[in-house]
A protein has these predicted regions:
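Active-site-proximal alpha-helix that buttresses catalytic centers in soluble enzyme cores
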Residues: 1-262
């Protein structure tokens, strides 16, 4: 119970990797608390699988969106700002909005912020943040691993790849684990461009299971192994987007815009 009547609900997919959670989701929430001292900060994760894993393994219970909103209503919160840490406006974000809509009448005011990549301006900002953070050498191909989805928002990844090239970052490539561009597609482009050195980095808020296994794992089908088998020298940077101060600032700005709409 708290005496604040306004709150920010920070909604993330979640992660079972404690180390990356502290550097990403926790840090985003801490930044929100610091930026908006008159708001209570609540947490919700959308992955039922990860929440169940944490409960079983660590005894830690994390609310889903509906449970968090229920708790906020019980705590007397009247104004709710929902800020997702999702990268795209995909399946998880659609479900989050549906859950919030179902609880909207429990509060006086509700406003929902947007995911990381929502506008063309967001994309430009994120590209600048990537370049600033990872600054690949001219003879290196920086290959980013996005999650990917069967949702139509998957088109954002290919659009971002195009925008990297349009902004003169011809050595930065975007791929996905579960959507398009595929690893095979990215590898063809990297080979065609003549690069021999590859830097792999996750394009996800946390550097969790996908980053540690699908990207940098020792299994023969990991991105690292596939590039190495094709003759590339590979360096992995296991840093989630949530570790980038500029990405956290972008999420803060999205929350601020949501507050202005209340």
């Amino acid at each position: 119970m708290n005496d604040k009547k306004k709150a920010v609900l920070v909604v993330s997919f979640g992660t079972s990797y404690e180390e990356t959670r502290k550097k990403t989701i926790d840090q985003i929430e801490n930044d929100m608390a610091e930026a908006f001292p008159s708001y209570a900060i609540y947490r919700a994760w959308t992955s039922d699988m990860i929440r169940a894993k944490l409960l079983k393994r660590d005894g830690i219970r994390i609310y889903n969106v509906c449970e968090a909103l229920e708790a906020m209503a019980a705590d007397g919160i009247q104004e709710v700002i929902v800020q997702p840490t999702h990268v795209i406006n995909g399946i998880e974000n659609d479900q989050m909005k549906a859950d919030v809509a179902a609880y909207a009448d429990r509060f006086m005011r509700v406003s929902i912020g947007t995911p990381v990549l929502t506008t063309a301006e967001d994309s430009k900002y994120v590209i600048d943040a990537i370049v600033k953070e990872l600054h690949p050498a001219k003879d290196e191909a920086l290959v980013l691993m996005g999650h990917g989805t069967e949702h139509y928002a998957d088109a954002v990844y290919a659009a971002l790849d195009y925008q990297f090239k349009d902004l003169e970052h011809s050595n930065i490539f975007m791929g996905t684990v579960e959507g398009y561009p595929t690893l095979e597609s990215v590898m063809r482009l990297v080979q065609k461009a003549g690069y021999r050195h590859v830097v792999l980095a996750p394009f996800m808020i946390v550097a969790g299971d996908h980053a540690n296994n699908d990207l940098a794992g020792d299994e023969e089908d990991s991105w690292k192994s596939v590039f190495e088998a094709a003759g590339f020298s590979v360096r992995c940077v296991l840093k989630g987007l949530g570790e980038y101060a500029d990405i956290r600032k972008l999420l803060l700005s999205h929350a601020e815009k949501a507050m202005e709409q209340v």
